[in-house]
Design a protein with these regions (language model features):
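Short amphipathic alpha-helix used as the core "switch/output" element in two-component signaling
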Residues: 51, 74-89
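Active-site residues of response regulator receiver
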Residues: 66-68
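Two-component/phosphorelay signaling modules centered on CheY-like receiver
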Residues: 23-41
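Hydrophobic/aromatic residues positioned on beta-strands within the core alpha/beta folds
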Residues: 94-96
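Non-catalytic signal-transmission and effector/linker regions of two-component phosphorelay proteins
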Residues: 1-17, 23, 120-136
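His-Asp phosphorelay/catalytic-motif detector in bacterial-type signaling
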Residues: 58-61, 86-92
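Acidic, metal-coordinating helix/loop segments flanking the phosphotransfer/catalytic sites
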Residues: 42-62
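Alpha4 helix (beta4-alpha4-beta5 surface) of REC/receiver domains from two-component response regulators
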Residues: 73-77, 98-116, 122, 126, ...
Length: 136
C-alpha cells in the first residue's frame, strides 16, 4: 500500500542533493541533471550533505545518496540522521550504490528507491522525475 501512496505523491519542486564521494560520478550526475532542468547541489562527504540539508530543509526535493563514503559520516549515517529529523525525514531519498545492503539494513534505511551502480543515465532520470519537477 505504501508504494501506491508514493506513486500518487506529486513530484516536488526544489534542488536535488547529490551525495557521492567520487568526483567524476558526482560531477557527471550533476551535469546530467542540470542539462535536464534540475537544480543540483552536490556534496562529497556526509558531513557536507547534512550541513546542506540542515541549512535549507525546505529547499530540497530529493536526496541521491551513496552509502559508502570515506570519513566519519557515511551515507547510512546521513540517512539515519535524516530519518530522525522531522524537518528532513520527508525528503524523498534514492540510494545510489554499488553494494546493496542486507535486508535488515535496507529496511532500516527506508529509501524511496534504489539504483544500483553502474547505472544508465536514462534510468537515473526516470527515477528522479518520479520525485522532482524540473525548474525549466
Amino acid at each position: 500500500m505504501d508504494d501506491v501512496t508514493d506513486a500518487e505523491r506529486p513530484p516536488r519542486r526544489g534542488a536535488i542533493l547529490v551525495l557521492e564521494d567520487r568526483d567524476d560520478v558526482r560531477q557527471g550526475m550533476a551535469q546530467l541533471l542540470e542539462l535536464h532542468g534540475f537544480l543540483v547541489v552536490d556534496a562529497a562527504a556526509g558531513e557536507q550533505a547534512l550541513d546542506h540539508l540542515r541549512a535549507d530543509p525546505d529547499g530540497f526535493a530529493l536526496l541521491l545518496l551513496d552509502l559508502r563514503m570515506p570519513g566519519p559520516v557515511d551515507g547510512r549515517d546521513v540517512r539515519r540522521s535524516q530519518l530522525k529529523s522531522p524537518d528532513l525525514a520527508d525528503i524523498p531519498t534514492v540510494v545510489v550504490t554499488a553494494t546493496v545492503p542486507d535486508g535488515i539494513t535496507k529496511a532500516q534505511l527506508r529509501a524511496d528507491a534504489w539504483i544500483e551502480k553502474p547505472f544508465r543515465f536514462d534510468d537515473l532520470l526516470l527515477v528522479v522525475r518520479q520525485y522532482v519537477t524540473p525548474n525549466t
